[in-house]
Regions:
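Interhelical loop and adjacent transmembrane-helix boundary motif
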Residues: 4, 25-30, 61-64, 73-84, ...
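Membrane-interfacial helix termini and adjacent extracytoplasmic/periplasmic loops
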Residues: 20-24, 64-67, 73, 122, ...
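Transmembrane-helix boundary motif in ABC transporter permease subunits
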Residues: 22-27, 97-129, 142, 146, ...
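Transmembrane alpha-helices
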Residues: 36-37, 42-49, 173-177, 183-185, ...
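Hydrophobic alpha-helical transmembrane segments of multipass integral membrane proteins
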Residues: 43, 90, 94-106, 110, ...
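A structural signal for multi-pass alpha-helical bundles of membrane permease subunits
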Residues: 49-61, 141-152, 219-224, 232, ...
Length: 286
């Protein structure tokens, strides 16, 4: 007797009938909770920036720009009206550019040395690179102050610049070294197979490939230098940078021009990001 091997036909599915499984907690979290939490995080991040931009068009009655009074563009047309603000802003921009140049030049050389060469103390060098990033700014600022006082350095622009280059250097080294480590060595080998010497290979192959990492490290170093307050406060003496001016203004009254500068900084950063996205898309299409 043979067993019946025939199977019963599957039940027909009506047109329009859903074949998806019923929703559960996991599906609800994926479709509802995660987007809600993501929206709240974005709101938490960008709401202060929105408030800064809105209050840059405010005309406060008193010294503090904390309550909306009326719409005005006076702060935008008279940016340098508060005494000393534009001087502090100009000094911070100059220090940011100089600190970026110093940190990028030194950091790029250090990154190539650590990434491309094997030498005694290489592991210790990697550890030393990360130490300024892991050191609290209060500790770094006080240590630099002790060093400058011991060497009888007059605190001012020079000491601020040395301090900024020192703590920006680590971020540059880490960023550029990661870019160098991700390069394909076969590209340089192919250039040398085509009779290119080491200098030509570096400037025609290696440097263009590392350049995006150098640009990113430059932007990061400039942002860190321009925005720094703690280390600068320890080593500035009587010199006033823009973050120090903002801190002092918060004690005696915040003019709306500070909000204007913050709005301009956000718009410039946004423009840089948009330009980078456009360039990246064009390169991807090419």
């Amino acid at each position: 007797m043979s067993a019946d091997t025939t199977t019963s036909p599957a039940a027909p599915v009506k047109v329009g009938q859903s074949t998806k499984r019923p929703g559960g907690p996991v599906r609800w979290v994926r479709e509802r909770l995660i987007p809600i939490l993501g929206s709240l995080v974005l709101l938490y991040m960008f709401l202060p920036i929105f408030v800064v931009i809105v209050f840059s068009f405010n005309l406060p009655n008193g010294r503090f720009n904390y309550q909306w009074v009326q719409f005005s563009t006076q702060a935008w047309t008279n940016l340098c009206a508060p005494g000393g603000m534009c001087d502090a802003l100009r000094l911070s921009l100059i220090l940011g550019v100089l600190a970026t140049l110093g940190a990028v030049i030194l950091g790029t050389l250090v990154a190539f040395g650590i990434a491309r060469y094997r030498f005694r103390g290489r592991s210790a060098s990697n550890l030393l690179v990360f130490m300024p990033m892991a050191t609290p700014e209060v500790v770094m600022g006080s240590a630099l102050l002790t060093w400058f006082v011991t060497l009888t350095f007059a605190r001012g622009i020079t000491t601020i610049l040395i301090a900024h280059v020192m703590f920006c250097l680590s971020f540059v080294v880490v960023t550029v070294k990661a870019r160098i480590a991700g390069l394909d060595p076969r590209l340089e080998q192919a250039a040398m197979d085509l009779y290119a010497d080491e200098r030509t290979t570096f400037w025609k192959v290696t440097f263009p490939l590392v350049l995006p990492g150098i640009v990113g490290a430059s932007l990061l170093a400039f942002s860190l230098s321009f925005d720094d307050f703690i280390v600068t406060n320890f080593n500035s003496g009587s010199t006033v940078t823009f973050p120090m001016y903002v801190w002092g203004a918060a004690q005696r009254g915040t003019p709306p021009q500070i909000n204007v500068v913050g709005s301009l900084m956000f718009l410039v950063s946004l423009a840089i990001v948009l330009v980078a996205q456009v360039v990246q898309r064009r390169r991807a299409k090419a």
